Amino acid sequence: MNFNVIIDHTLLKPQATSQDIKILIEEAKKYNFGAICIAPIWVKLAKKELKNTNIKIVTVIGFPLGSQISAIKQKEASLAIAHGADEIDMVMNIGKFKEKDFQFIINEINQIKKEIGTKILKVIIETALLSPHEIADATKLVSSTNADFIKTSTGFSYRGASEQDLKTIKENKSEKLAIKAAGGITNLADMENFYRLGATRFGTSKSVSIIKNLTDKKNKY
């Protein structure tokens, strides 16, 4: 498996500067990563720097808490696309989900998908804050929307994706809904395991070291 092309090479630290983003972009070019995942403020810069490449620009909406007003999330998504984003990773409203206001969740996701049209929409459910039963319910909920992916984590909670998270999501998702694993993916073993469990996209800031380990592994044989 060519993992490079299904990695979203990620830099979402609040202290990241334009120079840090340029370094991220050069790494993405060097290692042929499928996409970079950055904060909305850097999308215009990335669009310019990635001209004449096939590397996609992923940005985040309602990040990292998900509790912004829906209209703000919609506007943020619309502006991100206008600035050159190819894909949107939005954070589900965790509080509304916890109090079982499921129609709110469905409406918000579908409104943002309508806003971005044919662009890819991933919904972050923040598995660290959910019980296994809630992860199952959230997966079914996202499956009922027009979202393209369900994503495990922001990387800003107390843990990222786990094997059990992936198993629960895989067991409860619709056939059309793809899985992005993110948060705490620091080594090749995790990525290979999550891939076997159904993840077809990966968000990680450790992309370079993971791919270097993969190359070393191949060179041993």
From Swiss-Prot:
<dbReference type="GO" id="GO:0006018">
    <property type="term" value="P:2-deoxyribose 1-phosphate catabolic process"/>
</dbReference>
<dbReference type="GO" id="GO:0009264">
    <property type="term" value="P:deoxyribonucleotide catabolic process"/>
</dbReference>
<keyword id="KW-0704">Schiff base</keyword>
<dbReference type="Pfam" id="PF01791">
    <property type="entry name" value="DeoC"/>
</dbReference>
<dbReference type="GO" id="GO:0016052">
    <property type="term" value="P:carbohydrate catabolic process"/>
</dbReference>
<comment type="function">
    <text>Catalyzes a reversible aldol reaction between acetaldehyde and D-glyceraldehyde 3-phosphate to generate 2-deoxy-D-ribose 5-phosphate.</text>
</comment>
<dbReference type="InterPro" id="IPR002915">
    <property type="entry name" value="DeoC/FbaB/LacD_aldolase"/>
</dbReference>
<protein>
    <recommendedName>
        <fullName>Deoxyribose-phosphate aldolase</fullName>
        <ecNumber>4.1.2.4</ecNumber>
    </recommendedName>
</protein>
<feature type="active site" description="Proton donor/acceptor">
    <location>
        <position position="180"/>
    </location>
</feature>
<dbReference type="InterPro" id="IPR013785">
    <property type="entry name" value="Aldolase_TIM"/>
</dbReference>
<keyword id="KW-0456">Lyase</keyword>
<keyword id="KW-0963">Cytoplasm</keyword>
<dbReference type="InterPro" id="IPR028581">
    <property type="entry name" value="DeoC_typeI"/>
</dbReference>
<feature type="active site" description="Proton donor/acceptor">
    <location>
        <position position="89"/>
    </location>
</feature>
<comment type="pathway">
    <text>Carbohydrate degradation; 2-deoxy-D-ribose 1-phosphate degradation; D-glyceraldehyde 3-phosphate and acetaldehyde from 2-deoxy-alpha-D-ribose 1-phosphate: step 2/2.</text>
</comment>
<dbReference type="GO" id="GO:0005737">
    <property type="term" value="C:cytoplasm"/>
</dbReference>
<feature type="active site" description="Schiff-base intermediate with acetaldehyde">
    <location>
        <position position="151"/>
    </location>
</feature>
<dbReference type="GO" id="GO:0004139">
    <property type="term" value="F:deoxyribose-phosphate aldolase activity"/>
</dbReference>
<dbReference type="InterPro" id="IPR011343">
    <property type="entry name" value="DeoC"/>
</dbReference>
<comment type="similarity">
    <text>Belongs to the DeoC/FbaB aldolase family. DeoC type 1 subfamily.</text>
</comment>
